[in-house]
Regions:
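Conserved small-residue
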Residues: 1-9, 107-108
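Intrinsic-disorder/low-complexity loop/linker signature
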Residues: 9, 132-133, 216, 226
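Flexible loop and strand-edge segments within Gram-negative outer membrane beta-barrel domains
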Residues: 11-51, 55-58, 68-147, 159-163, ...
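Short glycine/proline-rich turn/loop motifs
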Residues: 13-16, 147-153, 226-232
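Membrane-embedded beta-strand positions of outer-membrane beta-barrel proteins
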Residues: 48, 93, 170, 185-189
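Small-side-chain secondary-structure face that scaffolds active or pore-lining regions
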Residues: 53-74, 104-109, 163-167, 178-256
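Individual transmembrane alpha-helix segments
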Residues: 154-158
Length: 256
């Protein structure tokens, strides 16, 4: 048996897998794009910005039908408008926000535990994915099998969290030189809101255990079954917050 582990001559019954290398890619794709537009007239200035950021996960898809991998997408936007209502009155409107979607494997635990179990996985606990089937070691042939690197996440679905954040500022800046030169009044109001919702997509995947036949061929004993994704939300699957802010100031700036 030790020779088969060493020489990898029987990778089904006596596997030897580095689960980090088997489950994860060396790198993941990341992209960022931004567009800015600015302009205006004598009485109005504007600035508009939009951006997109994407980050793929490092897990290999292997034979899974659903995309369980880590994934992050963010779309951000901003628009600033300064308008001279009169020669002494400036009105500014600033709108900004972002929409982000984060997907994580549905392991039933926090993500730190997922990676710990991947590092703790036993090299001979399974043969990985063979002909589209997840194969785990047979305890009849090995005194100890433990858990393979796929046990904590593979074929269990994913969680998708969407967050929407909006920030709005309205500013009025009024010169009061008709009272005294250098005097001005500023009024600012802000509204901030955030809303998030989480969707859970659960599934299951059958596990196969290799069995050695008398003629030397290998068959598989099936445990469990494959199921399609089913979507749900838990009681803590959404949340929102909002706040208002108001500020008023009287400023005086003058050189004598």
């Amino acid at each position: 048996q030790l020779i088969k582990f060493r020489d990898h001559t029987d990778p089904i019954l006596y596997p030897d897998i580095n689960w980090i290398d088997y489950c994860m890619n060396k790198a993941a794709f990341q992209s960022q794009h931004n567009v800015n537009i600015s302009g205006g007239t004598d009485r109005m200035r504007y600035f508009v910005s939009a951006g997109m950021f994407t980050q793929d996960g490092m897990f290999k898809q292997l034979a899974a039908s659903d995309n369980f991998n880590f994934n992050y997408k963010r779309y951000n936007y901003r628009a600033n408008l300064d308008f001279d209502a009169t020669k002494t009155t400036l009105i500014s409107v600033n709108i900004g926000g972002r929409i982000e979607t984060k997907r994580t494997p549905e392991s039933g635990e926090d993500q730190n535990q997922l990676f710990r179990k991947l590092y703790w996985a036993v090299p001979f606990a399974g043969a990985g994915i063979v002909d589209g089937k997840r194969v785990v070691s047979n305890a009849d042939y090995l005194p100890f099998t433990g858990s393979d690197g796929l046990n904590s996440y593979y074929g269990k679905g994913f969680r998708s969290t969407t967050t929407n954040v909006l920030n709005v500022d309205l500013v009025l800046d009024q010169k009061l030189d008709f009272i005294t030169k250098g005097l001005s009044f500023k009024l600012k109001g802000s509204y901030n809101t955030s809303y998030w919702t989480q969707k859970i997509a659960s599934s299951s995947m059958a596990v196969y255990t290799p069995v050695l036949h008398d003629d030397g061929s290998i068959g598989y004993r099936k445990s469990g079954s494959d199921s399609q994704l089913s979507y749900s939300r838990n009681s803590n699957g959404e949340g929102k917050s909002r706040d208002w802010y108001m500020e008023a100031a009287l400023n005086y700036s003058r050189k004598f």
